[in-house]
């Protein structure tokens, strides 16, 4: 173990470059899950939620960004049994239940891109009152309404 660490330090000294984190080595030449995940993110969130967000990711946040792109969007959102509209509704229901307004806002935009209507969003929030409680549902309503206003849909 110690020899590996010493070898890395020596390689860095020889090249004069700081070693790049192992998870960033070949991300541009990534596998099918990466490509599929990026395509889903682009379709749902546009360039700001795909390429720009990835390009702006720090080395510290890179493992999370890579994992979410491959596993969440590349492998889960692309499974054939549920379409993206249904997945958006399920995702939003879970985010309301967890009271995560930032993620609700992100996924409201994605839901609209996936064909969810504002009436369906309202119905989802109303339905969540029974299962999640009034405070969480109200937070979901407010967050969704703010996003709809920003998008010119409210």
Model regions and ranges:
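Short Asp/Glu-rich motifs
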Residues: 130-131, 148
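Mid-chain, well-packed structural core segment of small domains
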Residues: 92, 96-122
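Residues at alpha-helix boundaries and the short loops/turns that link adjacent helices
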Residues: 44-47, 101, 115, 131
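Residue-level detector of well-ordered alpha-helical segments, enriched
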Residues: 64, 85-89, 103, 120-124, ...
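Short alpha-helical scaffolding segments that buttress acidic/His motifs in well-ordered protein cores
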Residues: 68-72, 89-96, 124-129
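Acidic, glycine/proline-rich low-complexity segments that act as flexible tails and inter-domain linkers
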Residues: 2-85, 113, 139-154
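Substrate/cofactor-recognition hotspot
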Residues: 134-138
